Amino acid sequence: MNVVLKQRIPLKIKRMGINGEGIGFYKKTLIFVPGALKGEEVFCQISSVRRNFAEAKLLKINKKSKNRVDPACSIYKECGGCQIMHLQYDKQLEFKTDVIRQALMKFKPEGYENYEIRKTIGMSEPEHYRAKLQFQVRSFGGNVRAGLYAQGTHRLIDIKDCLVQDSLTQEMINRVAELLGKYKLPIYNERKIAGVRTVMIRRAQASGEVQLIFITSKRLDFDDVVIELVREFPELKTVAVNINASKTSDIYGQITEVIWGQESINEEVLDYGFSLSPRAFYQLNPKQTQILYSEAVKALDVKEDDDLIDAYCGVGTIGLAFAGKVKSVRGMDIIPEAIQDAKENALHMGFTNTHYEAGKAEDVIPRWYSEGFRANALIVDPPRTGLDDKLLNTILKMPPEKMVYVSCNTSTLARDLVTLTKVYHVHYIQSVDMFPHTARTEAVVKLQRKE
């Protein structure tokens, strides 16, 4: 290694990495510099030395990129949640398309050099797009603060005005923090593993309805807090408590109880309505979700005699978009409340050709196949960890004729394509910017079974 810790070096940034950092070479050593942009000449200090690379802190920009902008966020550098807010937005979209190429080059699935990778679809107004927040709460000198941990640390950043967060949910979390302090509710302490640890607030774009979850180590009396919140925010329709007394980093425990209001809120996508219970997954960016799901529907190109599996179905949002176009839809999800929502949503929409089960895709689909069910269309929307090996093996043994992979992690997507391209051709990859100003992107992949 040609660098040492705390060494200060000049560096020319050759490209950007998948996490939005600048990448350069110093005496043949690969250096990652968060905050630096392609084409810039910088002065930086080595902050970490690894076996094959080093990381550095940006100290000074000697030659600035013409694509650099000044982030409007006052805590941009301190927070670290929006890794590329300093990059002009149209260039962010180009970067996200390139991230897909980088992932493919790393894993090299069959034929990757010839994949059609379409330009990333962006937002006309890429601010205040996050309809859901999950803020940690901590007490400092008797003052309750809500926010996120600074990237790579356990230091809480008090966030009062996030530029990517829905304005109403931000206003509500600010008030929640005040009320938790006012009524002296116990706030989470990592030594005692007790108190309110996290607050989730989600707003439905279509109805404007809001739901709130207090995640706490034990049941507490939130009555006074709820009374004030309901009086001040008429949009609030559901308040729930989730019990998580574990010492793990998992946000949620197994028990969720609605303590005030209705069981779910109402949302819409692709011109149909559905219900969302507090624990059910739904995309963070409702506006771009319309585009993402439209692209998924277009890519799968179903026929009326198709039998479709909607893996990782959540509340059924993607699968129900197909229910009126196919013979049958089957879906599964690991969250029982989401499956109950999916069943109720299908019933509300008048569909009798749907079937939903709680369970893991890698367990449920092989069982369905062993029972004789066959699907000729498959859509998967897995978590960032990608597809489980057991599910991949099931797909290889009995591949549906057509498949769409909706990915939120380009690295695990490229990894899974190594396996999937043994039986499928990749027609194209369409990325959609669900998270402006961050290094993350979503992608819709159209796959067709090889003959």
From Swiss-Prot:
[4Fe-4S] cluster binds at C73, C79, C82, C162. GO terms for molecular function: 4 iron, 4 sulfur cluster binding; metal ion binding; rRNA (uridine-C5-)-methyltransferase activity. InterPro entries: MeTrfase_TrmA_AS, MeTrfase_TrmA_CS, NA-bd_OB-fold, SAM-dependent_MTases_sf, TRAM_dom, U5_MeTrfase_fam. Its EC number is 2.1.1.-. Residues 2-60 form the TRAM domain. Pfam families: TRAM, tRNA_U5-meth_tr. It is an enzyme of class 2 (transferase). S-adenosyl-L-methionine binds at Q283, Y312, D333, D381. It comes from the Bacteria. GO terms for biological process: rRNA base methylation. Keywords: 4Fe-4S, Iron, Iron-sulfur, Metal-binding, Methyltransferase, S-adenosyl-L-methionine, Transferase. The active site is at C408 (nucleophile). Belongs to the class I-like SAM-binding methyltransferase superfamily. RNA M5U methyltransferase family. This is Uncharacterized RNA methyltransferase gbs0448.
